[in-house]
Amino acid sequence: MENIDPKDIQELIDRTRIYDVLTRYCRALDRCDVDLMRSVYWDDARDDHGVFNGGAQEFAEFIIREIQQWFEVTMHAIMNVHMELDDKTACTESYLFAYHKVRGDREKVEEIFGSKYLSQFDWSKVDGIPHVFYYGGRYVDRLEKREGEWKIAHRQVVMDWNHNEISSGIFDEGMFKTLTLRGARGHSDPVFKNLID
């Protein structure tokens, strides 16, 4: 049997812990959990997110407030994650796919999407109908390991593409009416009933 270098084992542990930080961020966004969001960043971390550029702890409060104000539901997922790391620092590029459902009032839709998007609709027919946008991009992060714990020290968000349209979501007809367990923000989401304390 081949001898396994303890450094290789430690690298696997570090990669797993870094990935956990990245996925906790997505959960924090979609469950609107400010405390969980803060927990993925160091106190002196920065987030350059486009709509916000500054201290990451302040960003946590800002982004959760914005999500609650503008969106009925969001879902963020990371896919391919490329990591380069040493003992104390990691640089990651995480491919991102996100879904956002925007409340259908004209003012909100215009603020999110802009007047060019708005002009393509007869608002007498679509007023009140939610709109959605799909977003593809990347989180480019520098994480640091301090006292054995990995957290984000700096995050940049890169947008690669987006797609926007009127929502065609169905919840009360066909097979969808039988799917009665629904996601929710905060601790009323079904996942919290299954968590191990």
Annotate each predicted stretch with a short phrase.
Residues 34-118:
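A solvent-exposed, acidic/Ser-Thr-rich amphipathic alpha-helical stretch
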Residues 16, 72-74, 132-134:
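Transmembrane beta-barrel outer-membrane domains
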Residues 101-132, 181-186:
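Mixed-charge, low-complexity intrinsically disordered segments
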Residues 1-27, 31, 39:
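Short, low-complexity N-terminal intrinsically disordered segments enriched in polar/charged residues
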Residues 91-93, 124-127, 136-173:
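Short beta-strand edge/turn micro-motifs at domain boundaries
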Residues 29, 41, 96-98, 156-159:
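Short beta-strand segments enriched in hydrophobic/aromatic residues
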Residues 157-164, 169-197:
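A hydrophobic membrane-anchoring alpha-helix module
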Residues 76-79, 135-139:
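Short beta-strand or tight-loop elements
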